[in-house]
Amino acid sequence: FNGAAPIACNNEHFGKAENILAPGRGINMGDGWETRRSRGKNFDWLIIKCATAAQVNKIQIDTHHFKGNYPDQCSIQASLVKIKPSAKKIVAMSKKWKQLLNKVKLKAHKKHNFRNKLIKKSKINYIKINIFPDGGISRIRLLGKVN
């Protein structure tokens, strides 16, 4: 993610979205991205522009320090966007992006590694992290090949 940047998110109540891209592991809950509690069928999301287009082979999602306030589940959508759209346009486009990682259960205070569950095998340069229903993620890392 060296050079990646958050483009848009729907909620940064307790922790800024940019924290999720910081180096190393989080030092406390405030050093991650955390959304306020929501009820019902809502979910929170964050869109990140990757530093370069690549084929993702592994995803790490770290809920370090998030013990009672980690998301129950998450999914990741992705796309290769060849134009330079506004943040508003990217948000609209993201609703139709394909799944990179189907909805998976998360656990408290743990580094989750997903390799075999990845769906999309082509190049991407944007991701959308969906967390269900809300909560905090300390870090996210994408590992793969730049072609």
Task: Please describe what each predicted stretch is.
Residues 1-45, 55, 65-147:
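Trp- and acidic/polar-enriched beta-sheet ligand-binding modules for extracellular glycan
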